[in-house]
Amino acid sequence: MARKNLLKGFKKPKGLEFAQQESTESYGKFTASPFETGFGTTIGNCLRRILLSSIQGYAISAVLITSHDADGVPHTISSEFENIPNVSEDTLEILNKLKQIRLRLSDESEQGDFHFEFKGPASITSKDFAVEGQLEILGEPFYVMELMKGANVSFDVQVDFGRGYVPAEVNEKYIEIVGTIPMDAIYGPVLKVSYAIEPCRVGQRNDYDKLILEIWTDSTVRPEDVLGEAAKIAKDHFSIFINFNENDYLGEDEDDNEEAVIKQLLATSINTLDFSVRAKNCLDSAGIKTLGELAQKSEDEIESMRNVGRMTLNEIHAKLAEYNLRLGMTDYSHLKNTIKVSRQKEETDEA
């Protein structure tokens, strides 16, 4: 049994600050304070480890390479140790370059197979593996291989959605076509994470922690999105250790902070909500970044936005209703009286 007022007097961050001016598709800087002494390091290290090891992404998991001679007769390159005729680079070197390609499927599906044909003389770069409307190649293009005169080679590439690092030995178990070469797949889209702790003053005390978190991704996903995913993973793992009903032990300080909780809810990023790609793109184009900004829009304003149809409008209504919100809520006092903050929303969604 937990003690009453378990968190009374315990300092917790009021929200997350996002450095908008410094952010890009591949970089984000976040600040949260105040934490009790030591908690900044605990939270920062936990998020860093999850971000680097457990975020999902896309990678090439297998490739079938076929060379064609002058008469068009095909020959399958059976392993990474067999070289491709009239290609300057070793097959192993080419496979290493393919591992480095950062990509994503346009329809957000979990697997895709793509066929590419190249003839020499030509210099092939990472961008040559893009398929319009289906397979996006992110980042600056880089050199993959040089095809000499007479080279005629095709690549059948399998792209998978996964988590972390999966060695070729594991991917080999799922190969069905003889001659397909399994590859080490690095799915994680997070390239680098660093955090720093600075002293933070609250009242007369200056020994609280301020957590500064910096995230670099490969541009396939935005830093604020992967941070939300990492926090969700951590929360779900910690929840099994709670052996009491949290609603029965809400401290008085949480009741006093109702307004702060509502503000935090309204500051929720649209990118962290489970909207469809179409709805997200419409809201992003209209400059709507948070749940509060969306709730303040009228239905007429939403309908006038580009590419918003009836299905997208219904989706927005349904999403706002999950938080007991609706379109056209512009009076803050009205929000405070009508919003019922569900402290266990995510647990209910999953149950």
Curated annotation (Swiss-Prot):
<dbReference type="InterPro" id="IPR011263">
    <property type="entry name" value="DNA-dir_RNA_pol_RpoA/D/Rpb3"/>
</dbReference>
<comment type="function">
    <text>DNA-dependent RNA polymerase catalyzes the transcription of DNA into RNA using the four ribonucleoside triphosphates as substrates.</text>
</comment>
<dbReference type="InterPro" id="IPR036603">
    <property type="entry name" value="RBP11-like"/>
</dbReference>
<dbReference type="Pfam" id="PF01193">
    <property type="entry name" value="RNA_pol_L"/>
</dbReference>
<protein>
    <recommendedName>
        <fullName>DNA-directed RNA polymerase subunit alpha</fullName>
        <ecNumber>2.7.7.6</ecNumber>
    </recommendedName>
</protein>
<dbReference type="GO" id="GO:0046983">
    <property type="term" value="F:protein dimerization activity"/>
</dbReference>
<dbReference type="GO" id="GO:0000428">
    <property type="term" value="C:DNA-directed RNA polymerase complex"/>
</dbReference>
<comment type="subunit">
    <text>Homodimer. The RNAP catalytic core consists of 2 alpha, 1 beta, 1 beta' and 1 omega subunit. When a sigma factor is associated with the core the holoenzyme is formed, which can initiate transcription.</text>
</comment>
<dbReference type="Pfam" id="PF01000">
    <property type="entry name" value="RNA_pol_A_bac"/>
</dbReference>
<dbReference type="GO" id="GO:0003899">
    <property type="term" value="F:DNA-directed RNA polymerase activity"/>
</dbReference>
<comment type="similarity">
    <text>Belongs to the RNA polymerase alpha chain family.</text>
</comment>
<dbReference type="GO" id="GO:0003677">
    <property type="term" value="F:DNA binding"/>
</dbReference>
<keyword id="KW-0548">Nucleotidyltransferase</keyword>
<feature type="region of interest" description="Alpha N-terminal domain (alpha-NTD)">
    <location>
        <begin position="1"/>
        <end position="245"/>
    </location>
</feature>
<dbReference type="InterPro" id="IPR011262">
    <property type="entry name" value="DNA-dir_RNA_pol_insert"/>
</dbReference>
<keyword id="KW-0240">DNA-directed RNA polymerase</keyword>
<dbReference type="Pfam" id="PF03118">
    <property type="entry name" value="RNA_pol_A_CTD"/>
</dbReference>
<dbReference type="InterPro" id="IPR036643">
    <property type="entry name" value="RNApol_insert_sf"/>
</dbReference>
<feature type="region of interest" description="Alpha C-terminal domain (alpha-CTD)">
    <location>
        <begin position="262"/>
        <end position="351"/>
    </location>
</feature>
<keyword id="KW-0804">Transcription</keyword>
<dbReference type="InterPro" id="IPR011260">
    <property type="entry name" value="RNAP_asu_C"/>
</dbReference>
<dbReference type="GO" id="GO:0006351">
    <property type="term" value="P:DNA-templated transcription"/>
</dbReference>
<dbReference type="GO" id="GO:0005737">
    <property type="term" value="C:cytoplasm"/>
</dbReference>
<keyword id="KW-0808">Transferase</keyword>
<dbReference type="InterPro" id="IPR011773">
    <property type="entry name" value="DNA-dir_RpoA"/>
</dbReference>
